[in-house]
């Protein structure tokens, strides 16, 4: 059985003052049976790791190379040195804003794994692809192209985030989420065997305290990658509790 993971992606939000929200979350009554992850901006990783308690800290991206002339980029080794244990790779905002393709995501995932980080690999279809009826083909191809052969249930997490649901308040129906997650699970098992069965599959896209419980009741949903609702402990805490109760 896959472990449960509640992951928060702060994106480009937060300065040092915002770490009070992390401390509030860490000092609260976190339920057993759920791993909790916060991915703050890179400028906060070291300070966040010092204050996170049992909460894991991750980066939001890494370079595929370990070092070199790559101004503004961070290697997976650097993230690990700063205190990160996870890193998000291939988020749709990176794919869209920086032109990252599946081959780039695969190379970064390999780099993360080599550095000892858990890679949270993101995939998802656009609204046009959803309306064209090609969702399963699109996410299946992204999954195949983005994951290297060395994937295990310990070093990789897959997050399905329909691009049209991120930050829009729009959420797929539960049947639509189930269809995609069941297909992804089948693809993972076909390629990776037992590891594919136990690898956590997260849903992301406008997850909030009010809809988390029903989303976590969907088959093959092992947690969530949460954006805006992870910025405040008062919002993220109930999502974590809903996952624990699922």
From Swiss-Prot:
<comment type="similarity">
    <text>Belongs to the triosephosphate isomerase family.</text>
</comment>
<protein>
    <recommendedName>
        <fullName>Triosephosphate isomerase</fullName>
        <ecNumber>5.3.1.1</ecNumber>
    </recommendedName>
</protein>
<dbReference type="InterPro" id="IPR022896">
    <property type="entry name" value="TrioseP_Isoase_bac/euk"/>
</dbReference>
<dbReference type="InterPro" id="IPR035990">
    <property type="entry name" value="TIM_sf"/>
</dbReference>
<feature type="binding site">
    <location>
        <begin position="227"/>
        <end position="228"/>
    </location>
    <ligand>
        <name>substrate</name>
    </ligand>
</feature>
<dbReference type="GO" id="GO:0019563">
    <property type="term" value="P:glycerol catabolic process"/>
</dbReference>
<dbReference type="InterPro" id="IPR020861">
    <property type="entry name" value="Triosephosphate_isomerase_AS"/>
</dbReference>
<dbReference type="InterPro" id="IPR013785">
    <property type="entry name" value="Aldolase_TIM"/>
</dbReference>
<comment type="pathway">
    <text>Carbohydrate degradation; glycolysis; D-glyceraldehyde 3-phosphate from glycerone phosphate: step 1/1.</text>
</comment>
<keyword id="KW-0413">Isomerase</keyword>
<keyword id="KW-0312">Gluconeogenesis</keyword>
<dbReference type="GO" id="GO:0006096">
    <property type="term" value="P:glycolytic process"/>
</dbReference>
<dbReference type="GO" id="GO:0005829">
    <property type="term" value="C:cytosol"/>
</dbReference>
<dbReference type="Pfam" id="PF00121">
    <property type="entry name" value="TIM"/>
</dbReference>
<feature type="binding site">
    <location>
        <position position="206"/>
    </location>
    <ligand>
        <name>substrate</name>
    </ligand>
</feature>
<dbReference type="GO" id="GO:0004807">
    <property type="term" value="F:triose-phosphate isomerase activity"/>
</dbReference>
<dbReference type="GO" id="GO:0046166">
    <property type="term" value="P:glyceraldehyde-3-phosphate biosynthetic process"/>
</dbReference>
<dbReference type="InterPro" id="IPR000652">
    <property type="entry name" value="Triosephosphate_isomerase"/>
</dbReference>
<keyword id="KW-0963">Cytoplasm</keyword>
<feature type="binding site">
    <location>
        <position position="167"/>
    </location>
    <ligand>
        <name>substrate</name>
    </ligand>
</feature>
<feature type="binding site">
    <location>
        <begin position="9"/>
        <end position="11"/>
    </location>
    <ligand>
        <name>substrate</name>
    </ligand>
</feature>
<comment type="function">
    <text>Involved in the gluconeogenesis. Catalyzes stereospecifically the conversion of dihydroxyacetone phosphate (DHAP) to D-glyceraldehyde-3-phosphate (G3P).</text>
</comment>
<comment type="pathway">
    <text>Carbohydrate biosynthesis; gluconeogenesis.</text>
</comment>
<dbReference type="GO" id="GO:0006094">
    <property type="term" value="P:gluconeogenesis"/>
</dbReference>
<comment type="subunit">
    <text>Homodimer.</text>
</comment>
<feature type="active site" description="Proton acceptor">
    <location>
        <position position="161"/>
    </location>
</feature>
<keyword id="KW-0324">Glycolysis</keyword>
<feature type="active site" description="Electrophile">
    <location>
        <position position="91"/>
    </location>
</feature>
């Amino acid at each position: 059985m896959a472990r449960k993971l509640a992951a928060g992606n702060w994106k480009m939000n937060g300065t040092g003052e915002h770490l009070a929200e992390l401390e509030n979350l860490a000092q609260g009554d976190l339920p057993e049976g759920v791993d909790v992850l916060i991915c703050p901006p890179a400028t906060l990783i070291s300070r966040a790791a010092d204050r996170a308690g049992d909460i894991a800290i991750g980066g939001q991206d890494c370079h595929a190379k370990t070092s070199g002339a790559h101004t503004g980029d961070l290697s997976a080794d650097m993230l690990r040195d700063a205190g990160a244990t996870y890193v998000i790779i291939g988020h749709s905002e990176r794919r869209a804003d920086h032109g990252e393709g599946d081959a780039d995501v695969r190379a970064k995932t390999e780099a993360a794994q080599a550095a000892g980080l858990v890679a949270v690999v993101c995939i998802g279809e656009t609204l046009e692809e959803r309306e064209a009826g090609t969702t399963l083909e699109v996410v299946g191809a992204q999954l195949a192209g983005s994951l290297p052969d060395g994937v295990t249930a310990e070093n990789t997490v897959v997050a399905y985030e329909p691009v049209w649901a991120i930050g829009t308040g729009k959420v797929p129906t539960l049947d639509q989420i189930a269809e995609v997650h069941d297909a992804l699970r089948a693809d993972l098992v076909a390629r990776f065997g037992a590891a594919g069965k136990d690898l956590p599959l997260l849903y992301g896209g406008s997850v909030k305290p009010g809809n988390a419980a029903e989303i976590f009741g969907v088959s093959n949903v092992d947690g969530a990658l949460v954006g805006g609702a992870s910025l405040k402990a008062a919002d993220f805490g109930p999502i974590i509790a809903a996952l624990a109760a699922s």
